[in-house]
Regions:
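N-terminal substrate-binding region of glycoside hydrolase catalytic domains
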Residues: 68-199, 204-229, 259-261, 271
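Noncatalytic carbohydrate-binding groove/subsite architecture in carbohydrate-active enzymes
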Residues: 229-373, 384
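C-terminal beta-strand-rich structural cap/linker in extracellular carbohydrate-active enzymes
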Residues: 479-497
């Protein structure tokens, strides 16, 4: 969830409660923490939560972890249901059912708060996570793959006393890694089966930006005095936590907390400081590239007042030129990774959506735009090689929700249609044969589907040279054949075998 304004054109209207902790002296260097923890910490418990008193049901088999390809391998990543995901607020009791019925494969929760589990040094209160545990069980039973954010330092562990969202004190790091190790041991197995761990949320935010938000759901590791905005310190933390998480579960996936990437640091903006977006570079310059599996980032567009029109001025991104801002951010991340020769990392956009930012009333044009944005953002994510694209959120922020007061929106319907039409298909290529029309081709076996729309909204002539089996629009409405014109409404065009 983004917490900053953006520049836009004028159009934008263990089983025990006691944690066994290594006895490290105050001031011990972080770099010594991994060795010390490995030598002094208790063995990983072989059991997890206390067994329920009710009769036992058969233990479900662990859910397979999707094989995620590096982000550059567009064309080999299976899309459709395998990359769709939705974030759900922990208070949303019926959220799991709605995510499943939307056809999503991922569910994201924010999150597990260290301060709630260990408010006092060494004293664990896992019972504080009862609601989260219920949601994790529901997700596993529904066959959803969970991305779980871990955040929130207790007061005794904070570098900045007033900021739970900020960095951890060096002398508390040993306690943190043992907490993470025990957390993974507890929740990586049935009945929870969590495999994806996101370390903080939006760490590239300065503490000053969220100073008035108690227990901020954002991260705030950002250091304005540092050339790389504190990324090096976050990278140092990854070096410590990564081996301990892997020791608890070798299949665990450690994801850099969803980078906000507020604006493009390569483009000077007189009214905007883009130093925060150098956070990732700071991680890599400090040698953090070997201590994570994937990168999570966030990419929101802003409604520009007319159906199908949106953009993000901070990245010079607009609907009819660059498409969704996730494309610009994905390419930026790939560029930074390449500059530092870091390979084999997958990318997940863990917060996507189009916002009616600070709208007093929500026009119907926005709801139409949000619905159209679903196939556009997912097709673009596939073309850019993302391994996941998580809608924020089920209930929404700045009107981005797929539900509105527990009622489905047009965007929810569009989400279901995408899942049905592109289920388990592979992205093949972008077809550039028709001027002014975006066409992305997907394939499974001998089934071929084009996702297509007029890029600038103009009514464009189109002559499909191959036989067409059927056409439906973004909301699943059948369209007559033959197709001769196309507008801003995204279409699913299934070709004859």
């Amino acid at each position: 969830m983004a917490c900053q304004a953006q520049t836009t054109p004028s159009l934008q209207p263990t089983v025990t409660n006691e944690a066994v902790v290594p006895k490290l002296p105050i001031g011990t260097a972080i770099s010594a923490a991994v060795t010390s923890v490995a030598q002094n910490a208790a063995p990983i418990p072989t059991t997890t939560a206390p067994a329920p008193t009710a009769a036992k049901s058969p233990t479900p088999a662990p859910m397979p972890v999707p094989t995620l390809k590096p982000a550059a391998n567009a064309g080999t990543i299976v899309v459709g249901n395998n990359t769709t995901g939705i974030e759900v607020e922990l208070a949303a009791g019926a959220g799991t059912k709605a995510v499943k019925e939307a056809g999503a494969a991922w569910i994201r929760y924010n999150g597990l708060v260290w301060a709630d589990v260990e408010p006092n040094r060494g004293d664990r209160k896992w019972e504080s996570q009862a609601n989260l545990e219920t949601r994790l069980k529901e997700a596993a039973e529904a066959g959803l793959q969970t991305i779980l954010i871990v955040r929130g330092a207790p007061k005794w562990a904070r570098q900045l006393e007033s900021a739970s969202c900020g960095p951890i004190k060096p002398d508390a790091m040993a306690y943190y890694v043992v907490f993470l190790r025990d957390m993974v041991a507890r929740y990586s197995v049935a009945p929870y089966n969590v495999k994806y761990w996101e370390i903080w949320n939006e760490p590239d935010v300065a503490s000053e930006a969220v100073a008035n938000i108690p227990d901020s759901p954002f991260g705030c590791w950002g250091n304005p005095k540092d050339e790389y905005f504190g990324g090096g310190a976050y990278g140092e933390t990854l070096k410590v936590v990564y081996p301990l998480i892997k020791s608890a579960d070798p299949k665990a996936q450690v994801i850099i907390g969803g980078l906000l990437l507020d604006c493009d640091p390569r483009v000077a903006k007189p009214d905007k400081d883009c130093k925060p977006s150098k956070f990732l570079e700071g991680i890599l310059k400090n040698g953090g590239g070997s201590f994570f599996d994937g990168i999570s980032f966030h990419a929101y567009d802003f409604f520009y007042g007319k159906s199908g029109q949106y953009g993000n001025g901070n990245w010079d991104s607009v609907w009819n030129v660059t498409g969704p801002v996730l494309a610009a951010k994905t390419r930026f991340i790939k560029e930074v990774l390449a500059q530092h020769n870091v390979k084999g990392k997958y990318l997940i956009n863990t917060e996507t959506g189009v916002l009616c930012y600070q709208c007093q009333t929500v026009p119907v044009e926005f709801e139409i735009t949000k619905a159209y944005y679903v196939p556009v953002t997912y097709a673009t994510a596939a073309a850019e090689g993302l391994s996941g694209n998580i809608w924020y959120s089920l209930s929404g922020w700045q009107e981005s929700g797929l539900l509105n007061k527990n009622q489905t929106t047009l965007a929810y319907k569009a989400y279901q249609v995408w899942s049905q039409q592109i289920k388990d298909m592979q992205f093949v290529a972008e077809n550039t044969a028709v001027l002014g029309v975006k066409i992305y081709e997907f394939k499974r076996g001998d089934k071929r589907v084009w996702v297509a729309w007029s890029n600038d909204g103009s009514l464009r002539p189109i002559n499909v040279a191959v036989p067409v089996k059927s056409i439906v629009d973004a909301l699943g409405n059948p369209k007559p054949l033959p197709l001769t014109q196309i507008d801003i409404t995204p279409l699913y065009i299934e070709l004859e075998k």
